[in-house]
Amino acid sequence: MDAYWRAANYLSVGQIYLRDNPLLKQKLTLADVKPRLLGHWGTTPGLNFLYVHLNRLIQTHDLNMIYVTGPGHGGPGLVANTYLEGTYSELYPEVSQDEAGIKRLFTQFSYPGGIPSHVAAEVPGSINEGGELGYCLMHAYGAVFDNPDLIAACVVGDGEAETGALATSWHSNKFLNPARDGAVLPILHLNGYKIANPTVLARISHDELEALFMGYGYEPLFVEGADPRQMHQLMASALDKAHGKIAEIQRQARSRGFSDRPAWPMIIFRSPKGWTGPREVDGKKTEGTWRSHQVPLAKLAEVPAHLGILEEWLKSYRPWELFDESGSLRPELRELAPKGERRMGANPHANGGLLLKDLNLPDFRQYAVEIGIPGTVTAESTRTAGLYLRDVMKLNAQERNFRIFGPDETESNRLSPVFQETDRVFTGDILASDMQLSPDGRVMEVLSEQLCQGWLEGYLLTGRHGFFSCYEAFIHIVDSMFNQHAKWLKVCREVPWRKPIASLTYLLTSHVWRQDHNGFSHQDPGFIDHVANKKADIIRVYLPPDANTLLSVVDHCARSRDYINVIVAGKQPQLQWLDMGAAVAHCRAGLGVWEWASNDEGDPDAVVACAGDVPTMEALAAVMIVREAFPSLRLRVVNVVDLMALQAPSQHPHGIADDAFDRMFTTDKPVIFAYHGYPGLIHRLTYRRTNHANFHVHGYQEEGTTTTPFDMAVLNKLDRFHLAKAVVERVPSLASPREGFAHFVESKLAEHDAYIRENGEDLPEIRNWRWLASAVDAQ
């Protein structure tokens, strides 16, 4: 095992430094060394040490195990180990199991046209890149939910352990049911240093460290030292003990049923940073300090003596004992690696698309809200979607491959029908007064948006399906996690052996226009802008205006692969516009003219466009006001449900053709656009369109407080009166009556303001408004 570890370390150092002379058959020269030295050595030998020991455990007990790398900057180690076990060469045949393959392995690392420095999607066996730190443990737990035979060995960097996301991840054990789930073996990689500072956990006492993790509900097993001979024995013993405890916990839960939350084992692995590397460089201690974090010998061209140190370092691993003359790993070492899918680099759970099964989905049409006349029936859109999700849960109960995630908001977001079918999962103490709480639940709620997202990502990456519901304003907490998942998906599409996984779907509700009761802190629609920055072939944004369109969108997203879907929909009782047939057609098109709300007869004086449920209602109310004041005015109403359909087809695959866009929005008429979010995004999406200069967008202007629902729209000039005024101001034929209409609008807004201050609620004409354009036209 020590020889195998040496082989992994040798290949790791070689990746950082060498581009030629891979087996040191000649004296090392500067020409053998890369001109730019990139990578991270400090964490790598520890990762290699753990990998070989986990290989032994897999071999001994025939385990189904994946390796989740928190300190993903140790990329050379994971590449080295998947190469040694053979997986890497199977997926990348050009990196062959010989001297030429080793040379290719070395040259490609952190090199133009090669591979990245981290444990990215290109690395076999990876489900966690570990570039942005903090997510490994939540990914590991997400991976083992509903995977009873899987163990996720999760290496947590001690620097990473200082992040908020990782700190809350330790509580994931309160949601793990050993009767039905797999197990996570956390391994705290305590090498003492970050880039230039000591780590917090390395500088507290043994007793305090042990008490900390016992308090989290774990049984810590310590493996500490620097002597490889002793450390091999200690690690083997600790892993055997940890596996025995995991097996016993699962045996009892599966034979007797779940009773009490167990204390799961974990390992605290204290070893020197940069272990086995140069002890000193230029008289300064390197091994066991922060100086070994990246490239210990970074100035080979400037300091000739460093080349000799590098050669001595490489030769300390005795590569001639590890590889034969052709460069192949010696057979006795090759036998130490597991075979087939038992290899951690080849485990199908780390390439979840291989295991993905389609969900059994109900016919969403059967949950339709019956609509006769548009704008006269009310419904809670998300509650309607909750009925659909309830039955998704029911139909997939046997497969156990669907969960709902959210930060204590499933009930608040009106998805409560799912609790007719399942509970919230919790394996801690449950009181008689608790509702919908059990160890067998399939709704995962914890008040950490990061933990919800990380669990869901781990669940999706290992071949299952999920759904994330969240307050719109607070989804920003996972902005950066969204970034990383979008980047992961982008790279996976470019890696042929990575199979498509289920899309990550957000339902953002309790949104900005209905957070009047909670105030300014809860009012922010900017996640859409953030999402729109990512690759067009990854992201989708939907703004269904009512319950039937929401049903159609949710069903579509549940069937999609390799996307990030963002759905924004309100939970409050709202007017409904489209029957199910019209809703399906509208969602399929992405946007369209609502003929029943238009009177333009093919030649509008202005276009009133809308995207989002509240903007749609306000836009239609504005149309009624304008048509009542100016009966001969021709208005066209366009509703947008797929926001990216606005973008040019050269920029997004959902973008409608330019000629179709021009027919819909005209090439020269004013377009008054009522939009759910920040107005700038609509201008950005439409800037390549012919008529973009005539788009006048009303949306959120960062005005808000605790007030009434309609006043939120007024504060941001998204209300029906400001929209109506905007139409009148921009139609040339209305120049004469424009001033009088402006006075009318001002009087209505003053009436509104006085009423809400006196009564604390919106005017009856606002609260009770219905779409009655036909009655207006008949006047």
Curated annotation (Swiss-Prot):
Keyword annotations of the record: Lyase, Plasmid, Thiamine pyrophosphate
Gene Ontology MF term list: aldehyde-lyase activity
Cofactor entry: thiamine diphosphate
GO terms, biological process: carbohydrate metabolic process
Gene3D superfamilies from the UniProt entry: 3.40.50.920, 3.40.50.970
Enzyme class (EC, first level): lyase
The enzyme's E.C. designation: 4.1.2.-
Domain of life: Bacteria
Family note: Belongs to the XFP family.
Cross-referenced PANTHER family: PHOSPHOKETOLASE-RELATED
Annotated NCBIfam families: PRK05261.1-1, PRK05261.1-2, PRK05261.1-4, PRK05261.1-6
Protein's recorded name: Probable phosphoketolase 2
Organism the protein comes from: Rhizobium meliloti (strain 1021) (Ensifer meliloti)
Biological classification of the source: Bacteria, Pseudomonadati, Pseudomonadota, Alphaproteobacteria, Hyphomicrobiales
